[in-house]
Regions:
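Core SAM-dependent methyltransferase catalytic element
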Residues: 203, 219-232
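A short glycine-rich, Lys/Arg-flanked "PGG" loop and its adjoining helix->strand segment in the class I
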Residues: 110-122
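SAM-dependent methyltransferase
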Residues: 107, 130-194
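Class I SAM-dependent methyltransferase SAM/SAH-binding core
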Residues: 46-85
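Conserved class I S-adenosyl-L-methionine
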Residues: 1-33, 35-44
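Conserved beta-strand signature within the Rossmann-like core of class I S-adenosyl-L-methionine
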Residues: 123-130
Length: 232
């Protein structure tokens, strides 16, 4: 999966407002419930970790993308490029923000939720968001091109049979004036509220709340935020 290529183009995608809005929602829950000792799964370039650090929360971030973790470490954030199954510490809250669960194939999702359960203390929270069907069909699909500095970026996203394939192409101008080309794809899957509810309950979580959230549009909720608690 093209997560490392996505890490290269992410700074040019102009998602700052959406990042701020969604992170504010997660941080509000952390602060209101006085949560501490938090693991951020799929932490990306560490934007949410920075919020936790500013608010003097104990935190740890993990991501499978080495490129993303390099950015975190350049910011002196506590983050590692390791798989969830390799985490040995226990936490009082786990977050997975900005479609992390949509990147996980259906057949692997139950294992991911079980692994999340294993890194949490009893009574700990698991908070995550997923794209709604409206979010995939009406928001995520489409094409964009970005021409900036010495780079040209093309992104083409198509949603079909409950899967969103995003093709990313990056052209970068070299010192000799020629352009290099990198291409890769990212696959995301739609997970229904009913499917996620079933897996969570089977994996020892109680669902406290499922919130509809309008991130990109005022028309319909393009995201669902799950607030869960470990009970087994």
């Amino acid at each position: 999966m093209g997560l490392d290529l996505y890490a290269k183009v992410e700074p040019y995608l102009d998602f700052e407002e959406e990042v701020y809005t969604l992170h504010k929602e997660f941080l509000r829950f952390v602060m209101v419930n006085e949560l501490d000792n938090i693991i951020d799964i799929g932490c990306g370039q560490g934007y949410f970790l920075e919020n936790l650090m500013v608010n003097k929360k104990r935190y740890f971030g993990i991501d499978l993308s080495v490129e993303q973790i390099k950015v975190c470490q350049a910011k002196n954030l506590n983050a590692k490029a390791i798989a969830l199954k390799d985490v040995t510490e226990k936490f009082d809250c786990a977050t997975a923000i900005f479609d992390v669960l949509n990147y996980i194939p259906k057949k692997e999702l139950k294992q991911f939720i079980k692994e999340t359960n294993l890194v949490l203390n009893q009574g700990a929270y698991f908070i995550f968001d997923v794209n709604s069907l409206f979010g995939f069909e009406e928001v995520a699909q489409g094409c964009i091109t970005i021409d900036v500095d010495d780079k040209f970026i093309a992104i083409d996203a198509n949603f079909e049979k409950n899967k969103l394939q995003t093709d990313i192409t990056l052209f970068e101008k070299q010192e000799n004036g020629m352009f290099s080309k990198e291409s890769d794809s990212i696959i995301q899957e739609y997970h229904s509220k009913e499917f996620l509810t079933k897996l969570l309950k089977e994996s020892g979580f109680e669902i406290v709340e499922i919130k509809e959230f309008n991130l990109h549009t005022d028309d319909n909720a393009d995201k669902l935020i799950f607030i869960c608690k470990k009970i087994a």
